[in-house]
Amino acid sequence: MTEDEKRRAGVLFFPGDPELKEIKRRTHNLNLDYNATYEDEVEKRAAILAEILGDLGEGSFFQGPITFHYGKHTHIGKRFFGNFNLTVQDDADVYIGDDCNFGPNVTIVTPLHPMVAAERTRLRTADGTERRLCWARPVRIGNQCWFGAGVTVCPGVTVGEGAIVGAGSVVTKDVGPHTLVGGNPAAFIKNI
């Protein structure tokens, strides 16, 4: 099983695998290209995003700067708005629905690392170099969600349609549809 097949299967994989590193390097360079554009370079920005992302719905806008890890594992619906410093570490798939709005400094993270150090570093190359391992869990965000500034979404989380996540929240568990959550860890505040 290749490292990419392991990644897709949700089992421990080596993110430093040359094939995976090449995909990430390409995406990281495209992030830099996007971040070097002016906001009025709409066509240039759209072309770069088309190269980075798995899917991007019409009418979407990214303030920039952006940081995608693989990019191609991120699927974004129509009329998405991403404010400054959007970071998506998409080792697993990330699905973002239509009409979502993200405040500045939103981070979506899909990789997890084993809690036991020996498991994180259990594989070594012939020269003794540690191969740090991780696995990844997909993140799903429904339509019409709003994330305040500084929200972090952790691996494996699903955020229901119409949910609002308050500024500075760390979302470690699923969020129900049409609810307001906030805090660290994010907790239910009320139905909306």
Question: Which functions belong to the PLM regions below?
Answer:
Residues 1-59, 115, 185-192:
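Terminal amphipathic alpha-helical/low-complexity segments used for targeting or macromolecular assembly
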Residues 4-5, 52, 130-131, 137-138, ...:
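Short secondary-structure boundary/capping segments
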Residues 8, 140-142, 176:
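Residue-level recognition of short, solvent-exposed, well-ordered loop/turn junctions
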Residues 66-76, 81-157, 184-185, 190-192:
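Flexible, glycine/small-residue-enriched loop-and-beta-strand segment within the central core
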Residues 152-182, 186:
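C-terminal/domain-terminus segments
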